[in-house]
Amino acid sequence: MSFVHQKCRNIDTVYLGSNIHRLNVPDNLVKWSQEWSGYNPPAHTDPKVDGAVWADPEIDEKTFQPSWNAIDGKINRVSYVCQYSFDPVTLRPLNPIGRTGLSGRGLLGRWGPNHAADPIVSRTNDNGDLEFVAVQRHDNGEWAIPGGMVDAGEHVSQTLRREFAEEAMHGIVDSENLDELWNNGKELYRGYVDDPRNTDNAWMETVVFNFHDSKGLLKNVALQAGDDAKALRWIAVNSNEPLYASHSHFIDLLKESHSH
């Protein structure tokens, strides 16, 4: 895989919610296949993760017997990228893209892949410009596609609809007027996310679907930021607005899919 992650190697700022800086990982030493005998990054798992019902326990806890690279009960531990491997000493899963300069789980609940779903709801405005719904994140103020984590036992299609409702419709999930919109989604991406929360042992993956409102179904729907977001607005795809994590790449895929 030629892709090299950037946002989860940022050493200019501390890791979200902590005072910890990542170890600097040069581009040529990102891949695990590159020998780096002295690699010893700081370890960090946020206190909010420790003991949380939605999170894994520590990897060496005797009662923790996960099925890696598999559907583990209600938890999907399969990576969209590849069969991930493990650190021979700690037995922790290894980020398939490579080193991040931080071990542990950071803010992520699961060892290995942490699955999300990102719905891009789009329309063509009166000027003929393609736009999408974006929300402003509380944690860092960046604009993002509404989305979130797939709950244990939840199907991705449910997550897409639920997350958009929670973040952009003030929690009104069952708006029958929008069934037609939700039933005509197009998958744009399935894979790894260069997310600032990623670590050597826990990382974000997502499925991105586009739901294009070609019939004006949203005209009579009051879109407003939910509790998880600071603000909401439509953003034109050609505005070059800086976006969170890999979301700019997803918008490039949206543009590409509407250019045919």
UniProtKB/Swiss-Prot annotation:
Residue ranges annotated as motif Nudix box: 148-170
Keywords associated with the record: Hydrolase, Magnesium, Manganese, Metal-binding
Stretches assigned to coiled coil: none
Cofactor names: Mg(2+); Mn(2+)
Binding, Mg(2+): E163, E167
Gene3D superfamilies found in the cross-reference section: Nucleoside Triphosphate Pyrophosphohydrolase (3.90.79.10)
Origin: domain of life: Eukaryota
One Pfam family hit: NUDIX
Domain Nudix hydrolase positions: 113-257
EC number, as in UniProt: 3.-.-.-
Function: Probably mediates the hydrolysis of some nucleoside diphosphate derivatives.
Record-given protein name: Putative nudix hydrolase 6
Species lineage: Eukaryota, Metazoa, Ecdysozoa, Nematoda, Chromadorea
